[in-house]
């Protein structure tokens, strides 16, 4: 049994219908009737000595579970068991996207775009380096102010001139030097009250 080749995923979407003995156009009532009939025939309690009946019963249950779920049945009808595997891996809502992106024309489009943009270097330059290091960057709208670079030296000079203009009276007294013991040796007694409680 270990030497047995693993079953490949089909894309036709017909084998589950064959398990139940139906064709692809079967209604949900036909699926239920066929399932009940085959489940009674191959149930493990009715065939305790037959391990093949237990395997057949598992296949019947699997086919019934997939074909009675409308979403899974639709995926199976379109893409076969490969579609069910993709739905398991990526989610049922992403199956169509997966098959579109894995089609030959989507791969060809990706390769052509890669070749036209020098392995996507142009895209990287436009997104990361602001369109050729800023040479081709888009113009700002008429009403908005454009951003410009200010050197740190110019900014420092501007801040110092603003400080000089803002102070009306110069500071004449130097602050007293302080150490860790300043509060301990001070002549006045410290007050632990806040301003509101004096």
UniProtKB/Swiss-Prot annotation:
It is found in: Cytoplasm, Cytosol; Membrane; Cytoplasmic vesicle, Secretory vesicle, Chromaffin granule membrane; Melanosome. Changing residue 135 to H: No effect on palmitoylation. No change in subcellular location. CDD domains: DnaJ. Gene3D superfamilies: DnaJ domain (1.10.287.110). InterPro entries: DnaJ_C_subfamily_member5, DnaJ_domain, DnaJ_domain_CS, J_dom_sf. Pfam families: DnaJ. Acts as a co-chaperone for the SNARE protein SNAP-25. Involved in the calcium-mediated control of a late stage of exocytosis. Acts as a general chaperone in regulated exocytosis. May have an important role in presynaptic function. May be involved in calcium-dependent neurotransmitter release at nerve endings. This is DnaJ homolog subfamily C member 5. It comes from Mus musculus (Mouse). The lineage of its organism: Eukaryota, Metazoa, Chordata, Craniata, Vertebrata.
């Amino acid at each position: 049994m270990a030497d047995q080749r693993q079953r490949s995923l089909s894309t036709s979407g017909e084998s589950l219908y064959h398990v139940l003995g139906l064709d692809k156009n079967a209604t949900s009532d036909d699926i239920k009737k066929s399932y009940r009939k085959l489940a009674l025939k191959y149930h493990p309690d009715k065939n305790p000595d037959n391990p093949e009946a237990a395997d057949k019963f598992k296949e019947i249950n699997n086919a019934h579970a997939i074909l009675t779920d409308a979403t899974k049945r639709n995926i199976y009808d379109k893409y076969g068991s490969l579609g069910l595997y993709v739905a398991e891996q990526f989610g049922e809502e992403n199956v169509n996207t997966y098959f579109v992106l894995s089609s030959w024309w989507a791969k060809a489009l990706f390769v052509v775009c890669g070749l036209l943009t020098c392995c996507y270097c142009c895209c990287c330059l436009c997104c990361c380096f602001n369109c050729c290091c800023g040479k081709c960057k888009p113009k700002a709208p008429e009403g908005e102010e454009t951003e410009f670079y200010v050197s740190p030296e110019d900014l420092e000079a501007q801040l110092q001139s603003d400080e000089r203009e803002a102070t009306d009276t110069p500071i004449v007294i130097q602050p007293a030097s302080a150490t860790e013991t300043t509060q301990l040796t001070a002549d006045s007694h410290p007050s632990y009250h806040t301003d509101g409680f004096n």
